[in-house]
């Protein structure tokens, strides 16, 4: 991979329990516009083993720092991360500020200033969902080998199977849980414990990006509620915030063209960033420049 002279390199960071395939469609859109794209499987995901280092957000940020240093040592960058990937980018900004001057734009999808929680709200449905998540996390933490044995016995078409799906389509957005199918239960448990214990850094470190930072979230996200993204935006006076109605945590999967357009816009030559025009995917919403 050789970045084009003078052009921005887009670096895409996926979330927990998925793989770099999350960005497959985005990559096609962005490279079609002449942009160089770097996407990779994070530690303990897809084709990247867990390794010997403890699985922490800090370690994942250090991994990304090494990737930037070795693969994209010079030239402008646009960084985009979803969910866990957004946390990794926040950690990168705090731990490795030397990259800041090169960052032409940053897109954080389903970002939060809070630690991880199984509780997405206070409604009866949210409480029931939280109970199920807690039971799943407890089982994975204390009996990972037993869970792996069970997953090996599941039909290959089951979303939690530990075998790769044979009839995976070559085009289109990948299902959300394809990453889980390639991730052992012990790694899933370690990742959850890492997220549960994580204490977010002072969010004001992101102020250095000014209006080059864009936060996006789905109004119906049950994993990282949009309220968490709004809380983060409230700490960043210059940030741009978009909350999309009728959209879940799968925002980048369901609307790859929209996300690609936002990234490409930031990858253009630096300058003032006016509000985005209304997107046709959301004809009944307010103009998508609902910036904080």
Each language-model region and where it sits:
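Conserved HGGG/HGGXW glycine-rich cap/lid loop of the alpha/beta-hydrolase fold
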Residues: 2-49
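The conserved beta1-alpha1 loop
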Residues: 13-15, 82, 217-218
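Active-site loop/oxyanion-hole signature of alpha/beta-hydrolase fold enzymes
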Residues: 36, 42-87, 91-101, 113, ...
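Flexible "cap/lid" loop of the alpha/beta hydrolase fold
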Residues: 98-146
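Conserved alpha/beta-hydrolase catalytic His-Asp/Glu region
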Residues: 143-207
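Short beta-strand/loop motif that positions the catalytic acidic residue
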Residues: 209, 215-217, 221
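Conserved alpha/beta-hydrolase "acid-adjacent" motif
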Residues: 222-228
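Catalytic active-site module of serine/aspartate enzymes centered on a nucleophile-bearing elbow/loop
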Residues: 237-292
């Amino acid at each position: 991979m050789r970045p084009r002279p003078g052009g921005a390199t887009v670096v895409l960071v996926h979330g927990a329990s998925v793989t770099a395939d999350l960005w497959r469609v985005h990559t096609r859109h962005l490279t079609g516009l002449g942009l160089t794209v770097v996407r990779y499987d994070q530690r303990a995901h897809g084709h990247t083993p867990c390794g010997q280092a403890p699985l922490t957000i800090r370690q994942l940020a250090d991994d990304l720092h090494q990737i930037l240093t070795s693969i994209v040592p010079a030239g402008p960058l646009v960084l985009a991360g979803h969910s866990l990937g957004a946390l990794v980018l926040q950690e990168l900004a705090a731990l490795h500020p030397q990259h800041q001057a090169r960052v032409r734009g940053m897109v954080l999808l389903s970002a939060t200033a809070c630690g991880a929680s199984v509780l997405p709200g206070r409604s009866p449905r949210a409480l029931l969902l939280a109970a199920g998540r807690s039971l799943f996390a407890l089982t994975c933490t204390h009996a990972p080998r037993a869970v792996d044995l069970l997953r090996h016995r599941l039909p290959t078409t089951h979303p939690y199977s530990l075998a790769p799906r044979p009839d995976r389509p070559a085009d289109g957005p990948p299902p959300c849980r394809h990453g889980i199918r390639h991730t052992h239960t012990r790694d899933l448990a370690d990742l959850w414990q890492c997220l549960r214990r994580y204490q977010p850094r002072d969010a004001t470190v992101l102020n250095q990006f000014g209006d080059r930072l864009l936060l996006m979230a789905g109004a119906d996200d049950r994993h990282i509620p949009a309220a968490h993204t709004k809380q983060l935006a409230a700490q960043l006076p210059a940030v741009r915030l978009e909350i999309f109605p009728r959209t879940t945590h799968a925002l980048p999967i369901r609307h790859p063209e929209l996300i690609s357009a936002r990234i490409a816009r930031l990858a253009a030559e630096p300058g003032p960033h006016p509000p985005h025009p209304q997107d046709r995917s959301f004809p009944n919403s307010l103009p998508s420049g609902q910036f904080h």
